[in-house]
Curated annotation (Swiss-Prot):
Induction statement: Strongly and specifically induced by organic peroxides. Repressed by OhrR.
Organism from which the protein derives: Bacillus subtilis (strain 168)
Gene3D superfamilies registered for this protein in UniProt: 2.20.25.10, 3.30.300.20
Source organism superkingdom: Bacteria
Official protein name in the record: Organic hydroperoxide resistance protein OhrA
Transmembrane segments: none
BP GO terms, sorted: response to oxidative stress
Pfam families attached to this UniProt entry: OsmC (PF02566)
Purpose: Involved in organic hydroperoxide resistance.
Similarity comment: Belongs to the OsmC/Ohr family.
Amino acid sequence: MSQPLFTATVSAVGGREGKVISSDRVLELDVAMPGTPRAKKLEKATNPEQLFAAGYAACFDSALQLVARTERVKVETEVTANVSLLKDEADQGYKLGVTLQVKGEGVSASELEALVKKAHGVCPYSKATSGNIDVTLEVAE
């Protein structure tokens, strides 16, 4: 394994109906499944899919900007990650599905699509999910 540039550390207590806390305490969030009594009772609660979506969107947008800089292309981008909890018919368990919606200003749709494909090849989240999670890339017109 390569030498880490940095390591993020977060602990969970109570699973999907508990809390997550980062070692530096920047994150200290209640976790609840949407629609559960706990979720209805809490004013603000997140869930693992929402946290994954936040990380993937930020990471992919950074990868997209890296690719654009490398290609000397100036583009303003916005990435929205939709992460769904799905029933896994293979084992009757659960799995994740991801749709990344990318908007860009300053380039044509075909140029943006090419940048998105390249970003998907270098994004650490995309690398981690490759072959494990179905990821759909959508480029907004």
